[in-house]
A protein has these predicted regions:
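Ser/Thr-glycine-rich phosphate-binding loops at phosphate-binding pockets of nucleotides
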Residues: 71, 84, 88, 97-112
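Short beta-strand/loop segment that forms part of the nucleotide-sugar
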Residues: 90-101, 119-125
Length: 310
């Protein structure tokens, strides 16, 4: 269930439907997990090198902000994404999983360019993709679980504060700098400083616009938090979610999200044909857009036409 603060403004019927959907999803999780345990004859499997222990998050940490980047076939915009973030981060932890494109080579290139900031790890177990039945059925402690994969990346960070970074996002440096300065000067320990990205899409004229169905990213998906044993990732029906007990603070728009600009949308489906991915791609393939000047929330943000040349 979402934190109570997120229910503000929601109708009673929306809350009831949300509760029912969560109950149904949890019944399905229990059923498919039970079937897998019967078949595999274990609750979960995880080799020591991939085991996540929440107590590891309480280690002494240095001042600054760590970024965690988890990657699968992100070659298209990866180098540009790293370049846009690296000056604003004190550390970037990159973990890639069984990529079939040039993602690992790009990671190594960037590590050599920024050896004082970038650490790269190859997570070898085959991670169940979000939206897959395998993801639903796996215990979050299993080395094949998307949840364990995220927590593994989190455990490799060494700075006080952590934020998620995606391989298809370009940071708006001026906007983020204000957040960075606030974090490092005020050192908030009880806040999740979340922010949004603009979901870019091409219009019929080949100009940058916004996805009509979702002009902005999910706000709670990206943000900065102080690491503790109570900040980690947990299992949800289709994907992982960030678990915390922090006050949530909105910091506005700070990045551009380029996923819908990719030529090969099938890469993100991991070859799966499920209801989750069919809905996902039908939405992204839709030609419906909001023109740049028609979306009030981005007034003052210049259209990033330089992205077209990346």
């Amino acid at each position: 269930m979402p934190p109570l603060s997120r229910l503000k403004g929601k109708s009673f019927s929306w809350i009831i439907n949300k509760v029912i959907s969560i109950i149904v999803e949890n019944i399905k999780i229990f059923y498919f997990r039970w079937r897998r345990v019967i078949h595999e004859k274990n609750i979960y499997r995880c080799r020591d090198e991939y085991h996540f222990d929440r107590s590891s998050l309480t280690k002494v940490r240095g001042a600054g902000i760590s970024g965690i980047m988890r990657l699968y076939n992100e070659e298209r915009y990866l180098e540009s994404s790293i370049e846009s973030y690296i000056e604003q981060l004190d550390e970037l932890i990159i973990v890639h999983n069984r990529c079939t494109d040039s993602t690992p080579e790009i990671c190594e290139k960037m590590r050599l360019k920024y050896p004082h900031k970038i650490k790269v790890f190859h997570y070898i177990p085959s991670v169940a993709p979000p939206g897959s039945l395998a993801h639903v059925a796996l215990d979050p402690r299993d080395e094949r679980s998307l949840v364990n994969y995220y927590n593994f990346a989190l455990s490799k960070t060494t700075k006080e504060y952590v934020m998620k970074v995606d391989g298809d996002c370009i940071l708006i440096a001026d906007a983020f700098l204000k957040i960075r300065e606030y974090i490092l000067s005020k050192k908030p320990s009880d806040e999740y400083n979340y922010f949004f990205g603009i979901n870019l899409k091409y219009n019929d004229m080949g100009e940058l616009a916004l996805r009509k169905s979702a002009p902005l990213t999910a706000g709670y998906d990206h943000g900065i938090f102080k690491v503790s044993k109570n900040t980690f990732f947990k299992h949800a029906y289709n994907y992982e979610v960030f678990s915390h007990k922090l006050k949530e603070k909105n910091n506005g728009i700070v990045f551009f999200h380029l996923k819908s600009l990719k030529e090969d949308l099938a890469v993100d489906s991991h070859g799966l044909d499920t209801e989750f991915y069919r809905g996902y791609f039908n939405d992204r393939l839709s030609q419906d857009v909001i023109e740049w000047d028609d979306f009030p929330q981005i007034r003052g943000i210049h259209r990033p036409d330089h992205i077209k040349s990346l």
